[in-house]
Amino acid sequence: MRKKFFLTSAAVLLTVATLQSAQAATDVQKVIDETYVQPEYVLGSSLTEDQKNQTLKKLGYDASKDTKDLKTMTPDVYSKIMNVANDSSLQLYSSAKIQKLGEKSPLEVKIETPENITKVTQDMYRNAAVTLGVEHARITVAAPIPVTGESALAGIYYSLESNGVKLPQENKDLAQEELKALSDINDENKDKSGFDANKLNVALADIKAAVAKAKESKGELTEDDVRKIVEDTLKNYKLDQVVTGNQVNVIINFAFNLSKSDILNNEDFTKTLKDLKQSIVAQAGDSFSNIDLNFDANKAIQDGGNILSSIWQAILDFFKSFGA
């Protein structure tokens, strides 16, 4: 009886934790819808006054209409938001604006200074923002000097948390892990024949959707399950012969970590990924003309499970025949 009580209590606690994390993902969009009718601006603390004015102009700031206080991302704020050691020498130039969009509008990200955001593309930001729980919003990024752009999302986290969103650390960690994986792989392959950043972004969107679908139907996924999803998806997008084994493992590690996250319990997660995929494909011209866009990486796991079930049933039937 005592054992049963402890097991029941553990199950209740696990359920509560799951619901809280899923609720946090939902709260992201709810707060955006309720609070960001006027845009909010987060500026890097390393900007000079001239750079600050220049960046605000790039972001579309209008002092007569944008009456919210400007926020500043300092090294101290960054360390608290990202749960890392405080480094006072950290240079923060990337700045961002976030504003709500209508419910039927897809997530938008625009880099106003693409010449200065050297490592992260608009679609990489969009992919990571979906992982964070953003469904429909307009995010704008700018920097006055060349920077990688990897810290820009931290400004979005800061803004959201300042407005009451309780972002689980795992959601932020996953979004940053994804952003780093995408930007590193893109940077390492940008001059390689056969590589296409659009295909990489769509492949990752498909991988995330397949992981969510597989977890819903199968429960906990093994690393082999996730590996199968990743490898089959990269092959479908003709990236399997382009990316290295180490890069594949980076994607697998991210996808496996994602499979354990409660962000997948957000019912709008896969819909937002579908919208993201469709918009990338629509803007990419003929890059996807020879690609199966209806490919389902989850099917391979289901087929594998069916084969194992058939083998197991055959074994049972074999032994039953002796008992008859």
Residue ranges and their predicted role:
Residues 39-43, 109-116, 139-146, 190-193, ...:
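Second-shell loop/turn segments in exported
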Residues 231-324:
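Charged, long alpha-helical assembly modules
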Residues 130, 135-241:
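Soluble oligomerization/assembly scaffold segments of membrane-associated complexes
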Residues 9-17:
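Bacterial N-terminal signal peptides
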Residues 79-134:
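Signal peptide-directed extracytoplasmic domains
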Residues 18-32:
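Sec-dependent signal peptide cleavage junction
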Residues 29-102:
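Extracytoplasmic strand-loop-helix segments at the start of, or within, the mature domains
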Residues 1-5:
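Positively charged n-region of N-terminal signal peptides that target proteins for export
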